[in-house]
Amino acid sequence: MKINLEVLDAYYLFDKVEIENLNTKELVPQMVFRRRLTKASKLVVEVLSKFDLKNSRIIYGSSFGELLSSANILKAILDEDMLSPTDFQNSVYNTAVSYASILFENRNEIVTVSSGDETSLKVLKAGAIKALDGDELVLICSETLNITNIEEINSCIDFLESVVALKVKVSNKTPSLDIKNIELKGFPSSIKHIMYIAQNFSKNRDNIVEVNI
């Protein structure tokens, strides 16, 4: 089965160490709420603020999830320290998109996907199936790998922080973006399909992607 998606808008951010100059303070004026946000949450809030998503369904993907919170929990266990309730709460995969949905009062469907290197491809497939209902969806992938001693195990990812979002709908138009056998050096493989689409998105033409289900 093949489903064509039209990409209506795209936005992405990435950095080799840490994405800076975010508008978190303006987007999240409540200090108590803002202090609870993980870095992934801040990135997702940032990209979603670029879209009109009051009633949009969201498909979110991350291979590594909330790596810092998970690392903090494991370190506390190793050191026989008390676990942080905030780290425990923030360690689940849907943390970032859940905070964003609360902030933007989005009460619609949210699906979280984690599938290793194929995460962004699975997000596209899930989004394509959901788009058959006829409405617009937001597809997001993010990775925040900038944690202590990450250099000891990382030898292939240049950009430790990255986030990308697409606004899509189903389409009958001819595909114009080929996502087969793509290469995207320096990025986590888990976001490469959606990041490739975003980087090749143009507002001056139709942006149609064929998704094989």
Enumerate the predicted regions with their spans.
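Conserved "HGTGT" condensation-loop signature of ketosynthase/thiolase-family condensing enzymes
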Residues: 1-122, 129-213
